UniProtKB/Swiss-Prot annotation:
Domain of life per record: Bacteria
Annotated keywords: NAD, Oxidoreductase
Binding site for NAD(+): 212-218
Active-site residues from the entry: 256, 290
Family: Belongs to the aldehyde dehydrogenase family.
Organism name: Staphylococcus aureus (strain NCTC 8325 / PS 47)
Catalytic activity annotation: an aldehyde + NAD(+) + H2O = a carboxylate + NADH + 2 H(+)
Record GO terms (molecular function): aldehyde dehydrogenase (NAD+) activity
EC number(s) stated in the UniProt entry for this protein: 1.2.1.3
Protein name: Putative aldehyde dehydrogenase AldA
Length: 495
């Protein structure tokens, strides 16, 4: 399926500030390409510090009125955004596929619908949110209010551009904040098109979208004195810098960072379910998922039964044109990511690891202009191996044999990360005991990589701070105010 890019994407995009697309302070632009073909899709404005300052000041001004907008009005606007996203689902999904390289079947069924659902969800959350009143005694009352923080500064990664943006924008504006958000410079196009929906629905200045380099305008957002709350999804290395900026300015930060999650397959697992779950864990979105189940821990009793099934399953995955609805895996998002994956394959070949499936870039049948890689399965001798400790961020699965549940738990916890994990077992008690023992923010049982609204998502250890995608995430974007009332009209007698 070939599409006319200009039916979906503009030739150039400005910065979205105060409800309008505007020129930046510099004439510099960044080329945005289709990673599956190398084709130029658009050019975006390269924001500078002056543009960040402009956007933050606009957001500060908009906050004065937006923070006073009633919950019912805000909720209706969030629902309108969600409705319009769904009405334009096919168009926005195609933009995401063209810009990111992921299959159209994923962007149509997951990325855009789930983004829309987050706006609907947080509309309901604020409508049902209630403060509390505590009658301390007959003359004293304590009222607890939840108030917006102010201007949110956010930067999101390139692997789920629209969905990750929705994770931050929806709760932030639902709580009454305004936001300055920057998508990755390589995958900004879906959010820039969705800005047209914000333009229709929201007051000016509530959502402002900058484009540029993370090391430039992204860093300027996080270090701006006018930003009251930071939110970031990306690598742990950059997460440290964001945390440092938050500490320097004494503002709160929500960080969703890297992972090296363990997917544990017990000897009583339903193997049909496990094979599907393993593929969901490592091949979904080409393995470019922070929660990817990239360490497979298989009970020794079923190892020789499961591994050949995985080899066959991996070899049958259709990797190809992301616009083809039959494609199961598309292109990696860029050359840097492909090179990183290849470096780990080279490390495997130079070590005592054994490549059981895949391990090659795909260039035949018209794939030579993109960044396509085979689903790859690699057996490593133990969890100390480089491939079992470091985040690869691609369709590369390391498999380790374990003798019992405790060894699986110990290996799962032997990581600097703690974002997610999985357990496959037909014994729910056994699975729950492992889930409770593994130190991660999310554990799936008998499935993997499901990320609906209404279930908290976030990590332990170096995988981040805070939780998103559930009603408690609203508190990330709120201040708690206590109003303490004494109705006795009596002196205390201390002075």
């Amino acid at each position: 399926m070939a599409v006319n890019v200009r039916d979906y994407i503009a030739e150039n995009y400005g910065l979205f500030i105060n409800g309008e697309f505007v020129k930046g302070s510099s004439d510099e632009t960044i080329e945005v390409t289709n990673p599956a073909t190398g084709e130029t899709l658009s050019h975006i404005t390269r924001a500078k510090d002056k543009d960040v300052d402009h956007a933050v000041k606009v957001a500060q001004e908009a906050f004065e009125s937006w923070s006073l907008t009633s919950k019912s009005e805000r909720a209706q606007m969030l629902r309108d955004i969600g409705d319009k996203l769904m009405a334009q689902k096919d168009k926005i999904a195609m933009i995401e596929t063209l810009n990111n390289g992921k299959p159209i079947r994923e962007t149509t069924a997951i990325d855009i619908p789930f983004a829309a659902r987050h706006f609907h969800y947080f509309a309901s959350v604020i409508e049902t949110e209630e403060g509390t009143v505590n009658d301390i005694d007959k003359d004293t009352m304590s009222i607890v209010r939840h108030e917006p923080i102010g201007v949110v500064g956010a930067v999101v990664a390139w692997n789920f551009p629209m969905l990750l943006a929705a994770w931050k924008i929806a709760p932030a504006i639902a709580a009454g904040n305004t936001i300055v958000i920057q998508p990755s410079s390589s995958t900004p196009l879906s959010l820039l098109e969705v800005a047209k929906i914000f333009q229709e629905v929201l007051p000016k200045g509530v959502v402002n979208i900058l484009t540029g380099k993370g090391s430039e305008s992204g860093n300027a957002i996080f270090n701006h004195d006018g930003v009251d709350k930071l939110s970031f999804t990306g690598s742990t290395d950059v997460g440290y810098q964001v945390a440092e900026a938050a500490a320097k300015h004494l503002v709160p930060a929500t960080l969703e960072l890297g992972g090296k999650s363990a997917n544990i397959i017990l000897d009583d697992a339903n193997l049909d379910l496990a094979v599907e779950g393993i593929q969901l864990g490592i091949l979904f979105n080409q393995g470019e998922v922070c929660s990817a189940g990239s360490r497979l821990l298989v009970h020794e009793k079923i190892y020789d039964q499961l591994v050949p099934r995985l080899q066959e399953a991996f070899s049958n995955i259709k990797v190809g044109n992301p616009q083809d609805e039959a494609t199961q895996m598309g292109s990696q998002t860029g050359k840097d990511q492909l090179d990183k994956i290849q470096s780990y394959i080279d490390a495997a070949k130079e070590s005592d690891a054994q490549i059981l499936a895949g391990g090659h870039r795909l260039t035949e049948n018209g794939l030579d202009k993109g960044f396509f890689f085979e689903p790859t399965l690699i057996a490593v001798p133990d969890n100390h191996h480089k491939l079992a400790q470091e985040e690869i961020f691609g369709p590369v699965l390391t498999v380790i044999k374990v003798k019992d549940d405790q060894e699986a738990i110990d290996i799962a916890n032997d990581s600097e990360y703690g974002l997610a994990g999985g357990v496959f077992s037909q014994n729910i008690t056994r699975a729950l005991n492992i889930a409770k023992a593994v130190r991660t923010g999310r554990i799936w049982i008998n499935t993997y990589n499901q990320v609906p609204e209404g279930a908290p998502f976030g990590g332990y250890k170096k995988s981040g701070i805070g939780r998103e995608t559930y009603k408690g995430a609203l508190s990330n974007y709120q201040q708690v105010k206590n109003i303490y009332i004494d109705t006795s009209n009596a002196l205390k007698g201390l002075y």
